[in-house]
Regions:
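Bacterial N-terminal signal peptides that target proteins for export
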Residues: 1-10
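The canonical Cys-X-X-Cys-His
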Residues: 34-42, 94
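Detector for the c-type heme attachment site
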Residues: 39-45, 99-103
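Gly/Gly-Pro-rich "capping" loops immediately C-terminal to redox-active cysteine motifs
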Residues: 26, 30, 45-74, 80-85
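Mobile acidic interaction elements
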Residues: 35-38, 76, 88
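C-terminal capping alpha-helices of c-type cytochrome domains
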Residues: 74, 84-109
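Electrostatic cytochrome c docking/interface patches
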Residues: 15-33, 47-50, 103-109
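Residues within well-ordered alpha-helical secondary structure of globular protein domains
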Residues: 35, 68, 97-100
């Protein structure tokens, strides 16, 4: 019985971050990404090598990075003011949009 409870608790711990990341709406994120495209491009692959590829990144990683830029925990002269006005919903939507694009998570053949 204890093993079953432990397994359920472990599963909940593992799956909870995935559920939180899945809350974003990729379609809304695409509409909200207009400012992002100036550096990260329409396809999320960056317009130059100095800009990070967002396409295919994990949504939870993208959301965490944006929240850290917004709070000042992560510093970047360009990203801090970009993330500052974003709501949690905006961040979830943007993260879902960029995670939905072909990119880093796309298997190669």
């Amino acid at each position: 019985m204890i093993a079953k409870k432990t397994m359920c608790a472990l599963a909940a711990t593992i799956l909870l971050p995935l559920a939180a990341a899945a809350d974003g709406n990729p379609e809304l994120g695409k509409m909200k990404s207009q400012t992002c495209t100036a550096c990260h491009g329409d396809d999320g692959r960056g317009i130059a090598p100095i800009y990070p590829v967002l396409a295919g990144q994990h949504a939870d990683y993208l959301a965490l990075a944006l929240k850290q830029y917004r709070s000042g925990e992560r510093s970047n002269a360009i990203m801090a003011p970009m993330a500052g006005p974003l709501s949690d919903d905006d961040i979830a939507d943007l993260a879902a949009f960029y995670a939905s694009l072909d990119g880093l998570n796309t298997p190669t053949r």
